């Protein structure tokens, strides 16, 4: 049976999706494991001091918040769907992600269905997952390999990390 440290490292590796070096993944995994095993001690540390409010609002969400903070550069985060789309385009500068389709969809769900098909068709196949809680109005997710999505969701469920396969959930 794997321990939480191994599960966290696997999760970080899959979320990083080849965008981080192994030494960075190891360091991030250690930080997340520390927050996971003892959230209060993590919050009391210099690294976690600015997140003290989270102990009152969502103490179980501390490890998720730490993952978000540590991997911030690979997240897409904003409060407007067209800005989210621009961030997705930046993730794939060489891929054919067209400009935001203003007026093409009657609602947000239709946009995310269209985007999912587009990412699925971008080799080797990607998926935008919802991850964590922005504790505000922001959409917050990251693009992962579609082949890894089920394992990511399993790891998140096992570790009590808030995530879903769709921005609509």
Which residues does each PLM region occupy?
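A sequence-level detector of short, solvent-exposed, charge-rich linear segments
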Residues: 30, 103, 107, 161, ...
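Surface-exposed, low-hydrophobicity interaction/linker segments
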Residues: 66-131
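Residue-level signal for secondary-structure boundary elements
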Residues: 19-23, 37-40, 96-100, 127, ...
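Acidic, proline/glycine-rich low-complexity IDRs
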Residues: 113-169
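Short amphipathic alpha-helical segments
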Residues: 3, 107-111, 148
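N-terminal, charge-rich interaction modules
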Residues: 2-92
